[in-house]
Structure formats: C-alpha cells, structure tokens
Amino acid sequence: VLFVSFYKDGSSCEVAALERLGVQCLFPREQFQMFCPVTAEKQAALAADYARLLTEIDARAADCFLVVLDEGADAFAGDLLPQQGLIDFLQRRGKNCEIILTGHSLPADLAPLCDYVTRMTKERHPFDTGAPARRGIEY
C-alpha cells in the first residue's frame, strides 16, 4: 500500500499509524499552507514538487495493490499536480492496483479513472456555532 498526502507534512497521527502497519508514505518537500494566500512563486514551487512526487508515485505504484492519493483531487483541481501526468498515471496503472483519490474538488474527467469516489458534504458542524478545533476530533 502506498499513501501519498499532498497537503500534509507527515506529522499527523494518521501517518504514524499507517507507518506502524507497514504502509509506504510519501509527502511533498514543499509545504502547502491551507488557509494562506499562495504567491505565484510558491505556486510554481509546489507544482514542481508535486510533479516530482508524481514521478515517484508512478515508480512505486507498480509494486502496490492500493494507492491512496490524499487530497489529490484538490491538488489536481488547483493546478498543482500536472493534470495530464495524473491522467496518464491513472490510465496506465496495473490492473491489480486500485486507486483512492480523495479531496473536495474531484473534476468530472477524473472520476471514471478512479476505483473509489466518495463525496462528503458538511451539513452541520460545531464550527458553524464558533466552536474551536478540538484535540482528538478535528486535529
């Protein structure tokens, strides 16, 4: 199994659990700051790093039966992942390699190339009433 997180740096608790289970985990070298403005220079650095990461994913996926591209749909929609590169990867992967592509912004042309597509929509959340993020729940 290969788990690739596009918007996290590897310090989240889910990664520690995955690594204890023997899951390969990959992360970008450039860090995306979710709620900070992205300059053109930062956008270019992220795009270059994500292109490098996609090359590494492609090389490692041949030995995997499952590849999770965490927030990959958002990286694709935000022009950070090379769009044709991701499409090519999804089309040429092995028959025994299933892909999970997560994110909020799944472009319609990617959905048919994925094995799992789930859309989650917030209808209610404690944030709506001004509650702060809680340890163990939101982080």
Positions of PLM-derived features:
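A generic structural signal for short, solvent-exposed coil/turn residues
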Residues: 17, 66, 91-93
